[in-house]
Amino acid sequence: MKLKSLLLRYYPPGIMLEYEKGGELKTKSIDLLELSPSTDVNTLVGEIQKVEPLITASRTKQVRLLVQRLQEKLRQHCDHNFYLFKVLRAHILPLTNVALNKAGSCFITGSYDRTCKVWDTASGEELHTLEGHRNVVYAIAFNNPYGDKIATGSFDKTCKLWSAETGKCYHTFRGHTAEIVCLSFNPQSTVVATGSMDTTAKLWDIQSGEEVVTLTGHLAEIISLSFDTSGDRIITGSFDHTVVVWDASTGRKVHTLIGHCAEISSALFSWDCSLILTGSMDKTCMLWDATSGKCVATLTGHDDEILDSCFDYTGKLIATASADGTARVYNATTRKCITKLEGHEGEISKISFNPQGNRLLTGSSDKTARIWDVQTGQCLQVLEGHTDEIFSCAFNYKGNIVITGSKDNSCRIWR
Amino acid sequence: MGLLSILRKLKSAPDQEVRILLLGLDNAGKTTLLKQLASEDISHITPTQGFNIKSVQSQGFKLNVWDIGGQRKIRPYWRSYFENTDILIYVIDSADRKRFEETGQELTELLEEEKLSCVPVLVFANKQDLLTAAPAAEIAEGLNLHTIRDRVWQIQSCSALTGEGVQDGMNWVCKNVNAKKK
């Protein structure tokens, strides 16, 4: 094994190692999730060297510099003030979802008008219209961090893979017998997973365009799906009230997480893959040990259905969005509620942390998106202007751009 | 509502839930009818650029009513909403005689759609509060409704504005929910 280069990863903090093994170029990461501006650099570098043989004595200085750079980034207080940059009359029917590439240079919008459009974030110009689906384009994704491909899942039961640069369609994945409503690339960008109202999920090979495996076992619609950070496991959340953990290479069921007493609305892994967070219409979120599949905590407090939930990038914090019009922040370690976000005048259907982890973005049926302080729960900004409810909203990786997509057929760029 | 609740309404409804598709030309009064059904304010209604969904309880049924915009440019997208439809409600502006031919054409095309085959159809002859409104019988004849053989159908005169006739139509809907020939 020979180390070729070291790269920084800001969110969550870490160092990426590119190395050669048996003539093949590989990468792995050293996660520094606990890093803070006050961490002692020399001690930390010593610890890294103890566990990582690739970091030899000759690399000490370089690693120390990288850690210091990460600390500087953590010190930079992210308090970006957003203003409306552009309104895009994006589609002739309501939007479904929006997604940004990692660089934030472009983003995509899906719509009831059966298209997905690719936009230039800096100018607001339309770059491509991805046409070909015969029904609503519902689920969309970039293959981040690469960002050169786009996957679209449609109510027409197919998924299409596109070039982000040219807008050319590489493959149409056929096989589902009902609407595709969720999808994700694996982190290596070799496979795309689709979840469907037909109660199955399927994995597709990006190169060949062939189906790899079908995940069968759910008794009702699959509406949420995500890979873990390594891409080895995948979880599916279903209207059958359960979440299933699957082995992504064999398609075998690893665990069934049983405990919620209503439909699942979201299911995802924490960054270090130790925990699984599930949100449900039963008004609670549950935390599960990802290895054993046992429930370790139930997060209560909401008065109505949980419509979305998420971890921050390091996995230390959890945010929940509810039909009761409030959102909550929980500590993932103590499982205690830290703050309650109050102010929306309608249900909150989307919530996400900025990559820095100090701000939350919520989208609501009250036609506004809001920016919140994670620690105090104070609403810092109301992003107003949409004339119908907001279906989707997202931060870019730098945390200084927000895209909102609405039922009013438009999307807005805030920066 | 949010995307998630759209998915929940999309799935094949349990027995007591009914999926109703509300279609018709632009300015026929579909959204006004929807709001009248939901007992909501109808004073500020603008052309629908997409869709509206409302759930109404009636005679033990939960009626999930999908109101889809009727402007010409979005009519090609109606078919996106056909799946799992239990009842089709077609709304006509009875006072807009110039467009009877156009509305008849659209209805004929809908009735030929495979995904809507055998789905009971209720035609609302709306805007009967206007003096110039054509009576339901005249509209039925103009649209050749009596030639429909593959499903149950009904025409009901109404005014979405005043609410007159709307409940009669919905009573017919509840009676014919299960009339979809399999």
Swiss-Prot record, chain A:
Regions annotated as coiled coil: none
Q: What does this protein do?
A: Required for axonemal dynein assembly and ciliary motility in ciliated organs, including Kupffer's vesicle, during embryogenesis. Facilitates the onset of robust cilia motility during development.
Which GO biological process entries does UniProt record here?
cerebrospinal fluid circulation; determination of left/right symmetry; epithelial cilium movement involved in extracellular fluid movement; establishment of localization in cell; heart development; intraciliary transport; outer dynein arm assembly; protein polyubiquitination
Would you tell me the Gene Ontology cellular component terms? ciliary basal body; cilium; cytoplasm; extracellular region; motile cilium; SCF ubiquitin ligase complex
InterPro entries from the UniProt entry: G-protein_beta_WD-40_rep, WD40/YVTN_repeat-like_dom_sf, WD40_repeat_CS, WD40_repeat_dom_sf, WD40_rpt
Q: What is its main location?
A: cytoplasm
Work out whether the entry's keyword set contains Iron. no
Could you say which protein family the record assigns here?
Belongs to the WD repeat WDR69 family.
Q: What is this protein called?
A: Dynein assembly factor with WD repeat domains 1
One Pfam family, short name please? Answer: WD40
Signal peptide start and end residues: none
Species the sequence originates in: Rattus norvegicus (Rat)
Its annotated compartments are: Cytoplasm, Cytoskeleton, Flagellum basal body; Cytoplasm, Cytoskeleton, Flagellum axoneme
Q: Which UniProt keywords apply?
A: Cell projection, Cilium, Cytoplasm, Cytoskeleton, Flagellum, Repeat, WD repeat
Curated annotation (Swiss-Prot), chain B:
Q: Where does Mg(2+) bind?
A: 31, 48
What GO CC terms are in its UniProt record? Answer: axoneme; centrosome; ciliary basal body; ciliary transition zone; cilium; cytoplasm; cytoplasmic microtubule; Golgi apparatus
**Where does this one sit in the cell?**
Golgi apparatus membrane; Cytoplasm, Cytoskeleton, Spindle; Nucleus; Cytoplasm, Cytoskeleton, Microtubule organizing center, Centrosome
* Chain residues carrying a lipid of type N-myristoyl glycine: 2
Q: Which SMART domains match?
A: ARF (SM00177), RAB (SM00175), SAR (SM00178)
Q: Which InterPro entries match?
A: ARL2/3, P-loop_NTPase, Small_GTP-bd, Small_GTPase_ARF/SAR
Task: Keyword check for rRNA-binding, yes or no.
Answer: no
Q: What is its main location?
A: Golgi
Which residues take part in binding GTP? 24-31, 48, 67-71, 126-129, 159-161
Q: Which GO terms describe its molecular function?
A: GDP binding; GTP binding; GTPase activity; magnesium ion binding; microtubule binding
Question: Which keywords does UniProt give here?
Answer: Cell cycle, Cell division, Cell projection, Cytoplasm, Cytoskeleton, Golgi apparatus, GTP-binding, Lipoprotein, Magnesium, Membrane, Metal-binding, Myristate, Nucleotide-binding, Nucleus, Phosphoprotein, Protein transport, Transport
- Read off the Gene3D superfamilies from this record: P-loop containing nucleotide triphosphate hydrolases
Q: How does it sit in the membrane?
A: Peripheral membrane protein
Q: Which residues carry this modification: Phosphoserine?
A: 5
Per the UniProt entry, what is one GO biological process? photoreceptor cell development
Question: What functional role does this protein have?
Answer: Small GTP-binding protein which cycles between an inactive GDP-bound and an active GTP-bound form, and the rate of cycling is regulated by guanine nucleotide exchange factors (GEF) and GTPase-activating proteins (GAP). Required for normal cytokinesis and cilia signaling. Requires assistance from GTPase-activating proteins (GAPs) like RP2 and PDE6D, in order to cycle between inactive GDP-bound and active GTP-bound forms. Required for targeting proteins to the cilium, including myristoylated NPHP3 and prenylated INPP5E.
| Assembly with partners or alone | Found in a complex with ARL3, RP2 and UNC119 (or UNC119B); RP2 induces hydrolysis of GTP ARL3 in the complex, leading to the release of UNC119 (or UNC119B). Interacts with RP2; interaction is direct and stimulated with the activated GTP-bound form of ARL3. Interacts with SYS1. Interacts with ARL2BP; the GTP-bound form interacts with ARL2BP. Microtubule-associated protein. Does not interact with TBCC. Interacts with RP2. Interacts with PDE6D; the interaction occurs specifically with the GTP-bound form of ARL3.
Q: Which family does it belong to?
A: Belongs to the small GTPase superfamily. Arf family.
The record's listing under NCBIfam families reads:
small_GTP
Protein known as:
ADP-ribosylation factor-like protein 3
Q: Tell me which species this is from.
A: Rattus norvegicus (Rat)
Origin organism lineage: Eukaryota, Metazoa, Chordata, Craniata, Vertebrata
User: What gene is this protein a product of?
Assistant: Arl3
